């Protein structure tokens, strides 16, 4: 039974054909090959990487270190399983790998602080560091125990949170070589590195505790220049003037506030030359390079003066040049037992997001590493990855009868310190039954030079009746523009210069901002209508009341179906209507990365009508941020494919699975809520099987005609006395999960 990656959505009705049995079951199925040039990508449908933080952990307790990437773009985990086939080691993407980890923000690093052989999790807590201990095993899998919401340290009898800025990455390392994990981090507002020594070995003789004292306010005896990335070595100004401090009082009086600079730094502590003291690699928010500081000391805790700095590290031939804010990670990523150097940006939105994982192979040893540049797109080269916020659309671009894949984006990084929005065209170089996509154009239509802004959204449809597909694009400013295809049926698309798309009154069509259009015959009259998602979360509907060759878009509703998907300040509604078994369905992508599924659409298109929300988290899909959806049977096998675009610039691919053994009865068993009494005629109580009701919401009660009934939820009770005798279904939400419960009024 495929329960790991499969959820079957079953729609059951009684008398109305619109509620006849329909299955929309999708399984993550990355089975369509994708090529760049002659190279077939190994992980095309894994979703991409923007601003990754790299660690390793044995997530399935098979003795192999797997790769975990925490991406700051949407605070999301990417899990790559270490697989072995004969002598071949490789990575395999684990769909929904994020479910193995607790929710984290800003940063995540896996370090075995208690030396039990299981790596623990260090992430951002407000003002510092939150810690989870790994208490899993091969039987239960990964399990996490929260050790502290905020790690504490002793500033000379003044215990307070060990401050680490949300933008920083500290060094978790055994600085004094005594067997427990210490921490290096920049001072809260200065240019100096603090050394927080773990007292676990000193106090208890075992490394199983996290008890810190500030051992040195100016570890390494250096400071950053407030105006550039030059470092002052052997610094004599406060707080470095006294060298090492056994356990200093945190005294801010000596600091010059005019020189306070620190706004973002990344640290990696390694004993590069194997001389028994830690050296330090630094990255800075304002500069593209990293700097190696060599420790001239002879023993930990007695002398940590840095004696040299190398701004071209790891080599003059291939120094790090990462726009912007490089961070460093020391992990074995090529399975040779030697830890390599990975460089990735640590600044959201302003950094490189397409060639953003630089791999330096360790050709030396772990004791004396030598890092040699290999590539600037480690793992990314094997994925569909086009920057930030992918938008997949299928269309036959060259008229060969095969649908091609066009990928729009929110934006991608453009050197130097700029951004651009583009379309990438993957031509279908396969067959009708065995599709294969090959990248043929990285800036289709030269979109980046047209000045249309960011997140330009394509929608295709023949709106002038000449047999070819025209193009409507939505802009971030809310405007829509029309590119008329003059190629004719069966030919490669050829577009005239764009013009504003106008409605039936000759007025330019525009919404508040971030227009997301779809051309779809919503009322099934043979004419393509226009639906537009908006940043504010609602859908705008224009019905086409013209002719096949002369469209006339008439505004009908600014809140179609009341399908408002806003869950926070912004919605970024990304609608996709499709028809299956003569029934219209609606998926809506959203800023929160979920996919909303609506039904009860046909016959409910007037302004003020309401669609039924079936799920606000369809298939538990989590795209991080900016989810988008496209549905089509790309290989003609009668099974729908689901393409999901997302924040990290790549795409998830699903296919309907009619062979699942999950039955309707099993789905009922998985329901957590019950209605009692049922049948009933007065007060109906909502009961949770596990006794846990949290943030219970009633989204509606509907009859079998799909008409919403007047009802109010008071605590966990609904008065149904005003309902007519008959069958209904309740749409309830408990702990963020939508459930549909049948009910009979007697």
Regions found by a protein language model. Name each.
Residues 1, 82-84, 486-487, 729, ...:
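Short alpha-helix boundary/capping motifs
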Residues 16, 417, 492, 580, ...:
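Intrinsically disordered, low-complexity coil segments
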Residues 666-746:
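C-terminal outer-membrane/trafficking sorting elements
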Residues 21-664:
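Beta-propeller-forming repeat regions
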């Amino acid at each position: 039974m495929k329960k790991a990656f499969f959820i079957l959505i079953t729609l059951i009705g009684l008398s109305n054909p619109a509620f006849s049995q329909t299955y929309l079951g999708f399984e993550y199925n990355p089975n369509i090959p994708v090529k760049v040039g002659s190279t077939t990508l190994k992980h095309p449908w894994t979703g991409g990487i923007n601003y990754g933080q790299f660690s390793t952990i044995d997530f399935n307790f098979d003795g192999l270190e797997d790769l975990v990437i925490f991406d700051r773009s949407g605070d999301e985990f990417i899990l790559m399983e270490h697989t072995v086939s004969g002598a071949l080691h490789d990575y395999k993407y684990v769909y929904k790998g994020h479910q193995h980890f607790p929710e984290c923000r800003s940063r995540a690093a896996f370090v075995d602080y208690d030396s039990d052989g299981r790596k623990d999790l260090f992430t951002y807590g407000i003002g510092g560091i939150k810690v989870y201990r790994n208490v899993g095993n091969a039987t239960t899998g990964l399990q996490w125990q929260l050790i502290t919401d905020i790690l504490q340290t002793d500033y000379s009898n003044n215990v307070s949170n060990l401050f680490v800025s949300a933008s920083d990455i500290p060094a978790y390392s055994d600085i004094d070589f005594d067997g427990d994990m210490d921490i290096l981090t920049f001072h809260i507002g200065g240019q100096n590195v603090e050394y927080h020594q773990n007292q676990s070995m000193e106090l208890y003789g075992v490394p199983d505790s996290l008890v810190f004292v500030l051992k040195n306010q100016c570890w390494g005896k250096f400071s950053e220049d407030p105006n550039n990335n030059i470092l002052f070595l052997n610094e004599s100004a406060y707080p470095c003037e006294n060298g090492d401090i056994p356990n200093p009082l945190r005294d801010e009086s000596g600091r010059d506030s005019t020189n306070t600079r620190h706004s973002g730094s990344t640290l990696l502590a390694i004993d590069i030359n194997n001389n028994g003291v830690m050296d330090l690699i630094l990255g800075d928010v304002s500069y593209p390079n990293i700097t190696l500081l060599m420790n001239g000391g002879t023993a930990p805790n007695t002398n940590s003066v840095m004696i040299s700095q190398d701004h071209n590290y790891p080599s003059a031939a291939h120094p790090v040049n990462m726009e912007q804010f490089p961070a460093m990670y020391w992990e074995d990523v090529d399975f040779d037992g030697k830890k390599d150097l990975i460089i990735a940006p640590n600044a959201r939105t302003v950094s490189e997001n397409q060639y953003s994982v630089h791999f330096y192979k360790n050709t030396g040893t772990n004791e004396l590493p030598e890092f040699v540049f290999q590539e600037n797109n480690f793992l990314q080269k094997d994925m569909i990855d086009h920057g930030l916020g992918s938008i997949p659309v299928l269309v036959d671009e060259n008229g060969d009868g095969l649908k091609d894949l066009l990928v729009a984006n929110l934006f991608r990084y453009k050197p130097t310190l700029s951004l651009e929005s583009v379309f990438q065209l993957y031509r279908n170089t396969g067959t009708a039954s065995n599709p294969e996509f090959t990248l043929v154009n990285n800036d289709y239509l030269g979109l980046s030079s047209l000045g249309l802004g960011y997140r330009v959204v394509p929608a295709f449809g023949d709106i002038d009746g000449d047999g070819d597909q025209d193009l409507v694009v939505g802009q971030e400013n809310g405007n829509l523009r029309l590119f008329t295809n003059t190629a004719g049926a069966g030919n490669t698309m050829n577009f005239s210069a764009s013009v504003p798309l106008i409605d039936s009154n000759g007025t330019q069509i525009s919404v508040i901002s971030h227009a997301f259009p779809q051309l779809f015959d919503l009322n099934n009259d043979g004419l393509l209508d226009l639906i537009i998602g908006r940043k504010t979360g609602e859908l705008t509907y224009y019905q086409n009341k013209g002719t096949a060759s002369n469209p006339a878009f008439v505004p009908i509703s600014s809140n179609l179906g009341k399908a408002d998907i806003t869950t926070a300040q912004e919605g970024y509604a990304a609608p996709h209507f499709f028809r299956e078994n003569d029934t219209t369905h609606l998926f809506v992508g959203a800023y929160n990365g979920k996919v909303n599924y609506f039904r009860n659409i046909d016959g409910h298109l007037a302004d003020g009508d309401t669609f039924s929300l079936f799920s606000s988290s369809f298939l538990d899909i989590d795209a991080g941020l900016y989810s988008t959806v496209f549905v089509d049977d790309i290989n003609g096998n009668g099974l729908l494919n689901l393409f999901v675009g997302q924040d990290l610039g790549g795409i998830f691919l699903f296919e309907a699975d009619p062979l699942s053994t999950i039955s309707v009865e099993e789905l009922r068993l998985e329901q957590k809520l019950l209605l009692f009494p049922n049948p009933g005629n007065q007060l109906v109580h909502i009961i949770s099987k596990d006794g846990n009701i949290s943030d219970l919401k009633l989204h509606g009660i509907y009859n079998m005609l799909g008409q919403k009934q007047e009802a109010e939820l008071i605590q966990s009770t609904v008065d149904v006395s005003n309902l007519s005798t008959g069958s209904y279904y309740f749409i309830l939400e408990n702990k963020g999960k939508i459930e549909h419960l049948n009910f009979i009024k007697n």
